[in-house]
């Protein structure tokens, strides 16, 4: 009987001191629980869908080079980018193509800006498709340096794929990247 009385007191104390909070309130950015809980809760998919569809500043350079149509209804510059779009779209991973990203005084346009479908975490994906070309390779390394100077870390929040004529991008590899980072 003594244990029941102690248990009742504990319940009464808990109820009198417990703050009502919804799971959404616990996940708000100023909540002490947000960092702890966010990996385990999926933001509302409608929010991610809205983010994907919301107008954004895109790269306006060389629109005539966007010749490859995709299943997502956008045009991209290369077959490899169309492969990435196909798989992102197929796995329902929210993304933007060539979305403006401010890096200090420079505006970059990463190939893909991606939101993790469960956590909402932001990733960027650069596909470097002409690594045979020395000028292209130099520019790619310069871009990579700029990203790292602004907190975009390879394999953490910056995904990188490369190809040459001898070693083209492989669909199975792209699918593996998507599964490793976004489908767990």
Model-derived regions: residue spans:
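Alpha-helical scaffold elements within enzyme catalytic domains, especially in hydrolases
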Residues: 3, 87, 91-93, 146-149
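Basic, glycine-rich
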Residues: 149-184
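Amphipathic alpha-helical coiled-coil segments
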Residues: 1-11, 15
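Coiled-coil heptad-register positions
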Residues: 12-15, 19-26, 30
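Active-site metal-binding core of divalent-cation-utilizing nuclease and nuclease-like domains
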Residues: 74-76, 89, 93-119
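Short beta-strand-loop-alpha-helix junction that forms the active-site gateway
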Residues: 109, 113-143
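C-terminal structured domain segments
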Residues: 131, 138-154, 165
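Solvent-exposed, charged helical/coil patches
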Residues: 24-93
């Amino acid at each position: 009987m003594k244990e029941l009385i102690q248990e009742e007191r504990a319940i009464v104390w808990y109820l009198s001191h417990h703050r009502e909070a919804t799971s959404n309130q616990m996940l708000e950015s100023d909540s002490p629980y947000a960092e702890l809980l966010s990996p385990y809760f999926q933001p509302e998919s409608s929010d991610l869908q809205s983010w994907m569809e919301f107008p954004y500043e895109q790269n306006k350079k060389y629109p005539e080079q966007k010749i490859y149509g995709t299943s997502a209804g956008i045009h991209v510059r290369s077959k490899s980018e169309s492969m990435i779009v196909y798989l992102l779209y197929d796995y329902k991973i929210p993304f933007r193509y060539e979305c403006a990203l401010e890096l200090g005084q420079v505006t970059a346009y990463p190939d893909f800006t991606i939101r993790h479908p469960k956590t909402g975490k932001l990733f960027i994906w650069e596909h470097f498709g002409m690594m045979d070309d020395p000028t292209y390779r130099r520019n790619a390394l310069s871009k990579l340096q700029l990203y790292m100077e602004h907190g975009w870390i390879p394999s953490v929040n910056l995904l990188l794929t490369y190809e040459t004529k001898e070693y083209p991008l492989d669909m199975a590899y792209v699918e593996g990247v998507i599964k490793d980072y976004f489908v767990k």
